[in-house]
Amino acid sequence: MKKMIIFAVVLGFTAALTASASDAKGNWDTLCAKCHGADGKGQTNMGRRLGAKDYTDASVQAALTDEAAFKAIKEGFKDKDGKTVMRPAENLSDEDIKGLVAYMRTFKK
């Protein structure tokens, strides 16, 4: 009986992690890919126009802390001239944003 309970707990935890990962990918595809690309390279028409960073580049990833990425997603991002280039993700929870940051980290090569 104990083995069945442990198995059920592990299975539930694994399912929750899988759901979180797929939610992050879905959020990326819906909210981020238009500029940053499905592959994170930022080479979409909009991404090139706005100067989106290449998240597959290890040096770009190293220069961006999780905290800075979280803040940019939560509050939006302005360029050096003060022009909004990324709107805040108002409909995402903090957990959703953390998931997006973690998903963005998977692009690093």
Task: Describe the role of every protein-language-model region.
Residues 28-38, 100, 104:
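The canonical Cys-X-X-Cys-His
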Residues 39-41, 59:
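Short, well-ordered turn and helix-capping elements at secondary-structure junctions
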